[in-house]
Protein backbone atom coordinates (compact mmCIF):
# COMPACT_ATOMS: atom_id res chain seq x y z
CA UNK A 1 0.00 0.00 0.00
CA UNK A 2 1.13 3.54 -0.77
CA UNK A 3 0.50 4.63 2.84
CA UNK A 4 3.47 2.52 3.92
CA UNK A 5 5.62 4.97 1.92
CA UNK A 6 4.19 8.13 3.45
CA UNK A 7 6.61 10.43 5.37
CA UNK A 8 7.88 8.97 8.63
CA UNK A 9 6.29 11.80 10.61
CA UNK A 10 2.91 10.28 9.66
CA UNK A 11 3.94 6.93 11.13
CA UNK A 12 5.34 8.63 14.24
CA UNK A 13 2.04 10.44 14.83
CA UNK A 14 0.12 7.20 14.26
CA UNK A 15 2.32 5.39 16.81
CA UNK A 16 1.83 8.20 19.35
CA UNK A 17 -1.94 7.98 18.90
CA UNK A 18 -1.97 4.20 19.32
CA UNK A 19 0.16 4.35 22.47
CA UNK A 20 -2.02 7.09 23.91
CA UNK A 21 -5.15 5.08 23.17
CA UNK A 22 -3.77 1.93 24.80
CA UNK A 23 -2.64 3.81 27.90
CA UNK A 24 -5.96 5.66 28.19
CA UNK A 25 -7.96 2.44 28.10
CA UNK A 26 -5.60 0.51 30.38
CA UNK A 27 -5.50 3.18 33.07
CA UNK A 28 -9.24 3.81 32.82
CA UNK A 29 -9.91 0.09 33.13
CA UNK A 30 -7.57 -0.12 36.13
CA UNK A 31 -9.36 2.79 37.80
CA UNK A 32 -12.81 1.26 37.31
CA UNK A 33 -11.82 -2.29 38.32
CA UNK A 34 -9.99 -0.95 41.38
CA UNK A 35 -13.12 0.89 42.49
CA UNK A 36 -15.07 -2.38 42.33
CA UNK A 37 -12.33 -4.19 44.28
CA UNK A 38 -12.37 -1.45 46.92
CA UNK A 39 -16.15 -1.68 47.21
CA UNK A 40 -15.94 -5.47 47.60
CA UNK A 41 -13.28 -5.16 50.27
CA UNK A 42 -15.38 -2.62 52.13
CA UNK A 43 -18.46 -4.84 52.09
CA UNK A 44 -16.83 -8.00 53.47
CA UNK A 45 -14.77 -8.84 56.52
CA UNK A 46 -12.30 -11.63 57.29
CA UNK A 47 -10.18 -11.39 60.41
CA UNK A 48 -6.75 -13.00 60.62
CA UNK A 49 -5.39 -12.06 64.00
CA UNK A 50 -5.52 -8.31 64.23
CA UNK A 51 -5.68 -7.87 60.45
CA UNK A 52 -8.82 -7.67 58.34
CA UNK A 53 -7.96 -9.25 54.99
CA UNK A 54 -10.84 -7.66 53.13
CA UNK A 55 -9.98 -4.25 54.53
CA UNK A 56 -6.49 -4.69 53.09
CA UNK A 57 -8.07 -5.66 49.77
CA UNK A 58 -10.06 -2.42 49.89
CA UNK A 59 -6.86 -0.53 50.67
CA UNK A 60 -5.10 -2.03 47.65
CA UNK A 61 -8.10 -1.20 45.48
CA UNK A 62 -8.06 2.43 46.55
CA UNK A 63 -4.29 2.65 46.05
CA UNK A 64 -4.55 1.21 42.54
CA UNK A 65 -7.37 3.61 41.69
CA UNK A 66 -5.29 6.51 43.01
CA UNK A 67 -2.32 5.43 40.90
CA UNK A 68 -4.48 5.26 37.77
CA UNK A 69 -6.00 8.66 38.54
CA UNK A 70 -2.59 10.28 39.02
CA UNK A 71 -1.23 8.72 35.82
CA UNK A 72 -4.25 9.88 33.81
CA UNK A 73 -3.87 13.37 35.28
CA UNK A 74 -0.12 13.76 34.81
CA UNK A 75 0.51 11.79 31.62
CA UNK A 76 -2.70 12.87 29.84
CA UNK A 77 -2.58 9.91 27.42
CA UNK A 78 -5.92 10.87 25.91
CA UNK A 79 -4.29 14.09 24.70
CA UNK A 80 -1.59 12.13 22.85
CA UNK A 81 -4.30 9.85 21.49
CA UNK A 82 -6.48 12.61 20.03
CA UNK A 83 -3.66 14.96 18.97
CA UNK A 84 -1.64 12.13 17.43
CA UNK A 85 -4.66 10.86 15.54
CA UNK A 86 -5.47 14.36 14.28
CA UNK A 87 -1.92 14.90 13.02
CA UNK A 88 -1.77 11.47 11.40
CA UNK A 89 -5.11 11.89 9.62
CA UNK A 90 -4.27 15.42 8.42
CA UNK A 91 -0.89 14.31 7.06
CA UNK A 92 -2.50 11.26 5.45
CA UNK A 93 -5.00 13.51 3.68
CA UNK A 94 -2.24 15.86 2.57
CA UNK A 95 -0.10 12.97 1.33
CA UNK A 96 -2.93 11.49 -0.70
CA UNK A 97 -3.68 14.86 -2.29
CA UNK A 98 -0.02 15.25 -3.23
CA UNK A 99 0.21 11.71 -4.59
CA UNK A 100 -2.83 11.79 -6.87
CA UNK A 101 -2.77 15.49 -7.81
CA UNK A 102 -5.48 16.82 -5.52
CA UNK A 103 -5.76 20.43 -4.38
CA UNK A 104 -3.49 22.24 -3.51
CA UNK A 105 -1.11 20.01 -5.49
CA UNK A 106 -2.67 19.78 -8.99
CA UNK A 107 -0.86 17.61 -11.50
CA UNK A 108 0.07 20.74 -13.43
CA UNK A 109 2.17 22.04 -10.52
CA UNK A 110 5.93 21.40 -10.97
CA UNK A 111 7.18 18.58 -8.76
CA UNK A 112 9.77 20.72 -6.95
CA UNK A 113 7.15 23.33 -6.10
CA UNK A 114 4.69 20.67 -4.95
CA UNK A 115 7.35 19.10 -2.70
CA UNK A 116 8.10 22.44 -1.03
CA UNK A 117 4.43 23.18 -0.49
CA UNK A 118 3.85 19.70 0.93
CA UNK A 119 6.69 20.04 3.43
CA UNK A 120 5.48 23.49 4.48
CA UNK A 121 1.93 22.20 5.05
CA UNK A 122 3.20 19.24 7.08
CA UNK A 123 5.31 21.57 9.23
CA UNK A 124 2.24 23.73 9.85
CA UNK A 125 0.20 20.71 10.95
CA UNK A 126 2.87 19.52 13.38
CA UNK A 127 3.41 23.04 14.77
CA UNK A 128 -0.34 23.55 15.27
CA UNK A 129 -1.29 20.20 16.81
CA UNK A 130 1.95 18.63 18.02
CA UNK A 131 2.77 20.72 21.10
CA UNK A 132 4.47 18.55 23.73
CA UNK A 133 4.78 15.57 21.39
CA UNK A 134 8.11 13.94 20.49
CA UNK A 135 8.65 12.71 16.95
CA UNK A 136 11.49 10.26 16.38
CA UNK A 137 12.03 11.31 12.79
CA UNK A 138 12.49 14.72 11.20
CA UNK A 139 11.58 13.55 7.68
CA UNK A 140 8.54 15.50 6.54
CA UNK A 141 9.13 15.39 2.81
CA UNK A 142 7.14 13.67 0.11
CA UNK A 143 8.67 10.26 -0.53
CA UNK A 144 10.04 8.92 -3.80
CA UNK A 145 7.06 6.62 -4.36
CA UNK A 146 4.61 9.44 -3.73
CA UNK A 147 6.40 11.55 -6.34
CA UNK A 148 6.52 8.64 -8.79
CA UNK A 149 2.78 7.96 -8.53
CA UNK A 150 2.10 11.66 -8.94
CA UNK A 151 3.61 11.59 -12.45
CA UNK A 152 1.34 8.82 -13.71
CA UNK A 153 -1.73 9.26 -15.89
CA UNK A 154 -5.05 10.40 -14.46
CA UNK A 155 -6.55 6.92 -14.91
CA UNK A 156 -3.72 5.33 -12.91
CA UNK A 157 -3.90 7.96 -10.18
CA UNK A 158 -7.68 7.66 -10.06
CA UNK A 159 -7.56 3.87 -9.73
CA UNK A 160 -4.93 4.04 -6.99
CA UNK A 161 -7.00 6.60 -5.09
CA UNK A 162 -10.25 4.68 -5.46
CA UNK A 163 -8.68 1.34 -4.47
CA UNK A 164 -6.26 2.31 -1.72
CA UNK A 165 -7.93 5.37 -0.24
CA UNK A 166 -11.68 5.31 -0.84
CA UNK A 167 -12.37 1.55 -0.93
CA UNK A 168 -9.97 0.69 1.89
CA UNK A 169 -11.37 3.42 4.13
CA UNK A 170 -14.94 2.46 3.28
CA UNK A 171 -14.21 -1.15 4.23
CA UNK A 172 -12.58 -0.01 7.48
CA UNK A 173 -15.61 2.13 8.36
CA UNK A 174 -17.98 -0.74 7.59
CA UNK A 175 -15.99 -3.29 9.61
CA UNK A 176 -15.59 -0.87 12.53
CA UNK A 177 -19.32 -0.11 12.56
CA UNK A 178 -20.12 -3.84 12.76
CA UNK A 179 -17.53 -4.42 15.50
CA UNK A 180 -18.86 -1.55 17.58
CA UNK A 181 -22.41 -2.84 17.16
CA UNK A 182 -21.40 -6.30 18.40
CA UNK A 183 -19.42 -4.91 21.32
CA UNK A 184 -22.25 -2.58 22.31
CA UNK A 185 -24.73 -5.47 22.28
CA UNK A 186 -22.46 -7.71 24.36
CA UNK A 187 -21.73 -5.00 26.89
CA UNK A 188 -25.38 -4.02 27.21
CA UNK A 189 -26.23 -7.66 27.87
CA UNK A 190 -23.57 -7.83 30.59
CA UNK A 191 -24.88 -4.64 32.20
CA UNK A 192 -28.44 -5.96 32.18
CA UNK A 193 -27.25 -9.22 33.73
CA UNK A 194 -25.41 -7.31 36.45
CA UNK A 195 -28.46 -5.19 37.21
CA UNK A 196 -30.69 -8.28 37.45
CA UNK A 197 -28.22 -9.96 39.83
CA UNK A 198 -28.17 -6.78 41.93
CA UNK A 199 -31.97 -6.81 42.12
CA UNK A 200 -32.02 -10.46 43.20
CA UNK A 201 -29.37 -9.90 45.88
CA UNK A 202 -31.10 -6.79 47.21
CA UNK A 203 -34.47 -8.58 47.27
CA UNK A 204 -32.96 -11.58 49.05
CA UNK A 205 -31.58 -9.39 51.82
CA UNK A 206 -34.79 -7.36 51.99
CA UNK A 207 -36.88 -10.50 52.55
CA UNK A 208 -34.45 -12.00 55.03
CA UNK A 209 -33.09 -14.77 52.80
CA UNK A 210 -29.50 -13.77 53.69
CA UNK A 211 -27.76 -11.13 55.74
CA UNK A 212 -24.81 -10.29 53.52
CA UNK A 213 -25.14 -6.83 51.95
CA UNK A 214 -23.21 -6.52 48.71
CA UNK A 215 -25.65 -4.23 46.96
CA UNK A 216 -22.98 -1.52 47.15
CA UNK A 217 -20.57 -3.80 45.32
CA UNK A 218 -23.08 -4.53 42.59
CA UNK A 219 -23.85 -0.83 42.29
CA UNK A 220 -20.12 -0.17 41.84
CA UNK A 221 -19.90 -2.89 39.17
CA UNK A 222 -22.86 -1.51 37.23
CA UNK A 223 -21.58 2.07 37.54
CA UNK A 224 -18.12 1.05 36.37
CA UNK A 225 -19.60 -0.83 33.43
CA UNK A 226 -21.67 2.18 32.44
CA UNK A 227 -18.60 4.43 32.73
CA UNK A 228 -16.60 2.07 30.51
CA UNK A 229 -19.40 2.01 27.96
CA UNK A 230 -19.39 5.80 27.98
CA UNK A 231 -15.63 5.91 27.47
CA UNK A 232 -15.67 3.50 24.52
CA UNK A 233 -18.61 5.26 22.82
CA UNK A 234 -19.68 2.11 20.99
CA UNK A 235 -23.11 3.32 19.90
CA UNK A 236 -22.04 6.79 18.81
CA UNK A 237 -19.04 5.51 16.87
CA UNK A 238 -21.12 2.80 15.19
CA UNK A 239 -23.45 5.48 13.85
CA UNK A 240 -20.54 7.72 12.81
CA UNK A 241 -18.76 4.93 10.94
CA UNK A 242 -21.93 3.68 9.27
CA UNK A 243 -22.71 7.17 8.00
CA UNK A 244 -19.14 7.63 6.76
CA UNK A 245 -19.16 4.28 4.93
CA UNK A 246 -22.40 5.14 3.15
CA UNK A 247 -21.07 8.56 2.22
CA UNK A 248 -17.93 7.11 0.64
CA UNK A 249 -20.02 4.98 -1.71
CA UNK A 250 -21.38 8.21 -3.17
CA UNK A 251 -17.88 9.77 -3.30
CA UNK A 252 -16.56 6.76 -5.23
CA UNK A 253 -19.27 7.13 -7.86
CA UNK A 254 -18.59 10.85 -8.21
CA UNK A 255 -14.87 10.32 -8.81
CA UNK A 256 -15.30 7.60 -11.43
CA UNK A 257 -15.40 9.89 -14.46
CA UNK A 258 -14.06 13.27 -13.29
CA UNK A 259 -11.79 14.89 -15.94
CA UNK A 260 -8.30 16.21 -15.14
CA UNK A 261 -9.37 19.86 -14.95
CA UNK A 262 -11.85 18.99 -12.15
CA UNK A 263 -9.83 16.23 -10.50
CA UNK A 264 -7.88 18.37 -8.00
CA UNK A 265 -11.01 19.93 -6.50
CA UNK A 266 -12.89 16.63 -6.56
CA UNK A 267 -10.13 14.98 -4.51
CA UNK A 268 -10.27 17.91 -2.10
CA UNK A 269 -14.03 17.37 -1.70
CA UNK A 270 -13.46 13.67 -1.04
CA UNK A 271 -10.81 14.43 1.57
CA UNK A 272 -13.19 16.88 3.20
CA UNK A 273 -15.51 13.97 3.99
CA UNK A 274 -12.65 12.29 5.88
CA UNK A 275 -11.95 15.51 7.74
CA UNK A 276 -15.59 15.76 8.82
CA UNK A 277 -15.52 12.19 10.12
CA UNK A 278 -12.36 12.90 12.10
CA UNK A 279 -13.93 16.06 13.54
CA UNK A 280 -16.99 14.06 14.59
CA UNK A 281 -14.74 11.42 16.17
CA UNK A 282 -12.82 14.11 18.07
CA UNK A 283 -16.05 15.57 19.43
CA UNK A 284 -17.20 12.13 20.58
CA UNK A 285 -14.10 11.44 22.67
CA UNK A 286 -14.75 12.08 26.39
CA UNK A 287 -11.90 12.94 28.71
CA UNK A 288 -10.60 9.87 30.50
CA UNK A 289 -9.74 11.95 33.53
What are these regions (language model features)?
Residues 1-196, 200-289:
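Conserved non-transmembrane functional hotspots
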Amino acid sequence: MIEEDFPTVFHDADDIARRGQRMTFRLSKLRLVSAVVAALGGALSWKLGRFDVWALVALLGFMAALYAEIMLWTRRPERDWTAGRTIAENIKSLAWRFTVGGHPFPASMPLAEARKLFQRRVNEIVARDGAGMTFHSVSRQATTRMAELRTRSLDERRQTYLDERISNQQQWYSDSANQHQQRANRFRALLLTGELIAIVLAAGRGFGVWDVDISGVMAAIVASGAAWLGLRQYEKLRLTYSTAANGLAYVSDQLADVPEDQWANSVLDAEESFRKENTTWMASQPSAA
